[in-house]
Amino acid sequence: VMIGTAGGSGARPHVEETVGIIEEIVKEKNLHFKMAVIQSEFEKEFVKEKIQKGDILPLGPVAELKESDVDESIHIVAQMGEEPFIKALESGANVILAGRSYDPCEFSALAISKGFDKALAIHMGKILECAAITALPGSGSDCMLGTLKKDSFVVEPLNPIRKCTALSVAAHSLYEKSNPYVLPGPGGALDLHETKFNQLSDTQVEVSGTKFVPTEEYFVKLEGVRRVGYRTMSPAATHDPIMIS
């Protein structure tokens, strides 16, 4: 079992809270297994040292990160790639719980560790992490099956009311992307210029030709959060049967 971006953001408190949930289940069910916990949060002083050394670069059109930005941040995390997951797998972990992670990692790490093509494993992971939005009708809360092969992978929905088409799977390249042909991530980018989407059956699509292009240096994305205000929730109720009716 691999869990990434624990708690939805992957900061240290979210990881620790998720560890607590797992420990509670373990105690209730009397389970025994080896678990690896991977943190992704950085201390502020470490990040500021990297700024001073010129090791932090702007991501796209955003402004340069300043030390004042770091001071105002509550949490700063880095989006890890599959490498820490693979290391945990090699250590014999049965359950891996990680902080902020590149979304495909939970699907690609095991495959890459077993020698499958990195580009195809990551591309399949990018599709699977979005659930069934690549199917017709699309859904973010339904299941997809991915089958990774030597030179391709096949995706198909598990719900009989849905189907994958070459167009619906290819269209996923447009989802939350600035460029549908180049999908950057930790340590490099997926190159989809030569990717092919082949309709195998009414519900199955085979994907091939995707390449992984590593960057000269290994970069990870930093994400931070700062307090901008407070939110108050004030629930109210009434017992008046006339008003309720």
Question: How does the language model describe each region?
Answer:
Residues 106-245:
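Small-residue-enriched flexible segments
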Residues 6-12, 67-77, 113-114:
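Flexible, glycine/proline-enriched loop segments at strand-loop-helix junctions
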Residues 6-16, 100-106:
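Gly/Ser/Thr-rich loops at beta-strand to alpha-helix junctions
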Residues 26-34, 60-67, 116-128:
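Acidic, His- and aromatic-enriched active-site or binding-groove loops in soluble protein domains
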Residues 21-38, 43:
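Terminal amphipathic helices with adjacent charged low-complexity linkers/tails
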Residues 2-5, 33-38, 96-99, 123, ...:
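General beta-strand structural signal in soluble alpha/beta enzymes
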Residues 43-98:
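An acidic, phosphate/nucleotide-engaging active-site surface
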Residues 16-28, 52-57, 110-121:
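A glycine- and small-aliphatic-rich helix-loop capping segment at beta-alpha/alpha-beta transitions
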